[in-house]
Each structure stands twice: as C-alpha cells, then as structure tokens.
Amino acid sequence: MRMTLVHLSLSLFSCLLLVLSPTFIASTPVSEPELVVQEVNEKINASRRNLGVLSCGTGNPIDDCWRCDPKWEKNRQRLADCAIGFGKHAIGGRDGKIYVVTDSSDKDVVNPKPGTLRHAVIQDEPLWIIFARDMVIKLKEELIMNSFKTIDGRGASVHIAGGACITVQYVTNIIIHGVNIHDCKRKGNAYVRDSPSHYGWRTASDGDAVSIFGGSHVWVDHCSLSNCADGLIDAIHGSTAITISNNYLSHHNKVMLLGHSDSYTRDKNMQVTIAFNHFGEGLVQRMPRCRHGYFHVVNNDYTHWQMYAIGGSAAPTINSQGNRFLAPNDHVFKEVTKYEDAPRSKWKKWNWRSEGDLFLNGAFFTPSGGGASSSYAKASSLSARPSSLVASVTSNAGALFCRKGSRC
C-alpha cells in the first residue's frame, strides 16, 4: 500500500498542493478502549434479551437495529445509527441526499460520467449511494472515496469485481454496506479523480478489496469479500475508529492487515472492532494481523484457516471474546495465534487474551501479558454473546438478499 497522491489543479492555489503532503484526518483515540468493549457487550446482551420480544430478532445488535423494518428502503439512512464498537460514529452520507447509481460503466476515471459509482463517491457533499438495479461494476482504476459517503447495496445484487476496488485514503465517515467485492486486481500508474476539483497520479495499487489509508470513522458491514490480489480489508497509516462487521470472507491468503509496519508508531492510535464476521472457506492467514493498536475481536465464526487466524507484531492489544475457532485438520496449524517478529521474551509481555472463546478440532489460543488483569476489568464486566451461539449470530454474514417491501 502507498500514500502517493500528486494533485493536478484547475487553479494556481490547487497547484500548490503538488508540493504538500495529503491532509491527515486524525481521530482522537478512545482513552479507555475497554469502555467501548463494554458497550459492545452490553448491546449484544440487550439484543439477546430482546429475542423473546422481537419476532425477527437474531441477537445480533446491528441487525436487530434495522432488519425488522419491512420499510427499510424508505428509511435507509437509519442504518448509520446501528454501528457498534470503535466505528460506531461513522455516519457516512446520513445527512445528505440519496444518489442513485444508474450506470455500471467506468470508462473515464478523470471525468466520470454522472450516474456512475465513481461520480458519486468523489462528490464533496454527503451522499447516501444506492443502486437502481443489479450491477457488476468493473473499475478501471481505484475507486477513491471522498468523505461522508455511504455505499449501500441493499435492494440490488452489486458486485465490484474484476478490476480495481475501493480506496479510503485520508478521508473520514465512510460506510460500505451490502456489496460483493471480489477478484480485485492491481492497477495504477494512471490519473484518477478524487474530488470534483482535483485529480492526481496514482502509483501502482496493491489490489485490496477495501484499502483504508489514514482514514477514520469507517464501517464495513454485510459485505462478501474474496479472491483479491493483496488484502481483503487493510487499514494502515494512522487509520482508526473502524468497525468491520457481518462480513463473509473466503478464498483468500492475506485476509486483513491492521497496521502498516512495526516502525510506524502512529498506528498505536488504531482501534478496530471486528464483530459477527464469518471467516469461511479457503482462507490462509491474517484474520486479522495486527500492529500497535487495540483490537476487539468478538463473536466471529472461524471455520477455516490454513496457517493461523489471529496474529500480530509490535505489541498490539488483542481482546478475543466469544469467538468460535474450528482448527484445520493439519496438526501443525491448530494454533489460533501467531506472534510475529519477536522472541518469546518480548511477546509474552504483550496483551493478547481469550475470554469465552470456543475451540474445536484441537484449536488453541496462546495468551500473553496481563490476561484478565486490571487493564481488562471493565471489558470483562459483561461477557459477549456465548460462543456456542456464534453460528446463529453470523448465519447471515455477507451481502444480504434484500427486496423492497419486505424485511431483509
């Protein structure tokens, strides 16, 4: 992944941007991340208690927030109030207009055609982007998003596939929901527009499904992701305030990288919630692979991995709660965890803990650091949904089949 973005300008003022670094949109990290963990667990338990009241309830607090409404398509922006965890304040285009994508083409990435997805995401104002019909969108170059945008695939079968994919670079308040993103390719060495007034030269991209680079307040929910050139969801270079939830991930090697490098200490501010995802068939490693920050991994279903599930380096804090881990049959790869680039004398001081996880077929988690010490006391005050029920909570992971006039 990279940060090169050379702006061409329509004015002398814009030309000055050629010599400046991109604006870094920072998000102040939560000073007590355990309180966010506690809030997530409270919402999970509240949804569980409401199962007897809501006939459509699942115990998944995100889904129970909006999926019971048969008129969801008339109140699409309500979804923005349903996130949990570190990305809960990502409002996307909640306060803007609805933009309907009517054209699946992507012929001109410098002057995108109105009605295309690219034309929608580069606008300066908040927009809630929906799709007029089922579409397969093959992007010619990276889809560079502007701030305060929601991509909402509900009501259509939307595939972003076979070309470049989504880049969230130095922007904030992004929601990506209900789309299929797969077979992403490396692109680049081309001019690409990133706003109505600027376009710039993009160097070669890695081919991630969703690349978050210096982004904040980002929520990726109910997407199906697979088979891309590099990562499925990668977040680096100071990205933070992220929730990754209800996604179905499959057929991929390096699934999720959270943190740029061991030496990039700005990622100490990274805080990510990973909840209710199904890590499915054909996955190898990095579910996720973490550096520096705080990572809450809660109520996910791990049914396949070939090397390891959760790994990291540079002393990240990993809080694993109520997940289900089904190990592969190969006895060499039963361990859930992988401590990287450090001897045991160092990694034993990191804070990796497992609470209420379910381990099947010989799976095991190697904890480190304080474990259930005071640093986790607040996070432990309420447990996540029991891991034995994870299969039901994640049964609808991935892009949903939603039709107007009925519940999703």
Curated annotation (Swiss-Prot):
Naturally occurring in which organism (per UniProt): Arabidopsis thaliana (Mouse-ear cress)
Top-level taxon of the source organism: Eukaryota
GO molecular function: metal ion binding; pectate lyase activity
Protein family according to the UniProt entry: Belongs to the polysaccharide lyase 1 family.
The keyword Metal-binding is annotated on this UniProt entry: yes
Glycosites: 45
Residues annotated as binding Ca(2+): 206, 230, 234
Gene Ontology cellular-component terms listed: mitochondrion
Cofactors, names only: Ca(2+)
EC numbers: 4.2.2.2
Protein name: Probable pectate lyase 5
InterPro entries: AmbAllergen, Pec_lyase, Pectin_lyas_fold, Pectin_lyase_fold/virulence, PEL
Keywords associated with the record: Calcium, Glycoprotein, Lyase, Metal-binding, Signal
Free-text remark on how the cofactor is bound: Binds 1 Ca(2+) ion. Required for its activity.
Signal peptide start and end residues: 1-27
Organism ancestry: Eukaryota, Viridiplantae, Streptophyta, Embryophyta, Tracheophyta
Active-site residues, as the UniProt record annotates them: 286
Keyword presence, Endoplasmic reticulum: no
Catalytic activity: Eliminative cleavage of (1->4)-alpha-D-galacturonan to give oligosaccharides with 4-deoxy-alpha-D-galact-4-enuronosyl groups at their non-reducing ends
Associated pathway: Glycan metabolism; pectin degradation; 2-dehydro-3-deoxy-D-gluconate from pectin: step 2/5
Gene Ontology biological process: pectin catabolic process
